[in-house]
Amino acid sequence: MKCAVAILLVCLTLQQAAYGFLYNEEVKTEFQRRKQSLEEAGESLKQMGQNLQDNMQRSLAEGQEALQKHIKNLQQSMLSQKEALRNRGEALRETVGERLESMQNQGKDWMKKMQEGRETLQKKLGEQVETFNQTFQAGRLAIAKKVLEGSETMRKTIQNTTQSLQDKAEKVQETAGKNVEALKLIARKNALSLKESLDTLRENSVEENMQALRNFLPSQSEAMDLPKEKLQELMASIQNNTGLFQESWGQEKEKMKEMLRGLKRKVGERTEDMKRKMKARKEELEAEFQSRGDEAVQTVMEIRNVTIKHLREAGKKIKEIEEKIASLLPNSCLDFLRSKALKMGVKIVVQDLKSVFRMGWLRVPETFEKEEEIAPSTEEDGSEELEADSYDSKVGGESPISQRTEERQGAEERSRLRRRRAAVLRRMFGQWSRKS
């Protein structure tokens, strides 16, 4: 049994060894066959790679030649479009220059008319003021003449009254002197008569003296009352004359005051009337100047809006040309486009295109900056700024500025141009890089 098993095991081992030998032979044969096929495939692949490399070099040369032709065509088209834009810009500049020159001439005419109107108004005002001054001087001279006449009349009246009063005083003094002499005579007579009476009284009796005294007293009192009555009449006449003089002087003063009040009232009415007329004329001239100024501002606004519209259309066409150039260029030319020479060429072209539309009086740099910002509110902001600028420079033209302000504005404009050119180049190469 054990021998059978051992024999069986030996047989199995021999069978497996025979199978292994046969399998190794087949593997070697398959390996040789596959190695040969791989060598044949490598040869064919090497041949195909050589053919592919030749084809690629030939296609690359053809592509470079086509690219150069395409670039030449693009340069020619850009030059033609640049020339067309330059011609259009020149025509637009000539048109705008003519409109600006006509507006400047019209503004000069309006300024000349305004100056003539101002001079005419000043001349009329000067004539009216001169007339008013002459009228006032004439009135003042008339018042002074009236016052002098009144004062002369018053002086003569006072002089006459004083003379009459002096005459009356002299008469009164003379009368008083005569009365004193008469009184002295009467006193002497009375003294003599009194002496005689005393002598008589000494000689006569008491009853006779009393009777004589009763007869003497009434006649003596009458003689003493006579000068008193004359003096009272003289004083009454003096008082009456003084009252009449004061009354006439008061009437003359009232007349002169009334005349002065009337003259002042007339002068005030004439002055107020003249002021009203001057104010009305001034308002009429201001309204006329305002209407003419509004018309000028409206014309300037229309011209500026039309110019800005043309400039925006030109900017849009420039953008379209840039986009068209970017879309036509193939992706394999990106490195060539980013080279320094082409950048300088594009920069020069953009600078030439934008220098065509540069006009300082229309503030075109601000307009290009607004066009570069792709936003919905760009046109509204630009129109509002233009309107604000137009209403800042109303009737009369632009005022002269100093040299320092002009230099600062020139420097700011140059810096804005540099920033704008850099932004345009960045946008162009950014579009080309995104498309590639």
Swiss-Prot record:
UniProt keyword terms in alphabetical order: Coiled coil, Secreted, Signal
Presence of the UniProt keyword Protein biosynthesis in the record: no
Biased amino acid composition, Acidic residues: 371-390
Superkingdom to which the source organism belongs: Eukaryota
Entry GO terms, CC: extracellular region
Region of interest (Disordered), residue spans: 371-419
Protein's recorded name: Uncharacterized skeletal organic matrix protein 6
Subcellular location: Secreted
Signal peptide span: 1-20
Lineage: Eukaryota, Metazoa, Cnidaria, Anthozoa, Hexacorallia
Source organism (scientific name): Acropora millepora
Tissue-wise expression: Component of the acid-insoluble organic matrix of the aragonitic skeleton (at protein level).
Coiled-coil positions: 25-87, 154-207, 247-329
Biased composition (Basic and acidic residues): 404-415
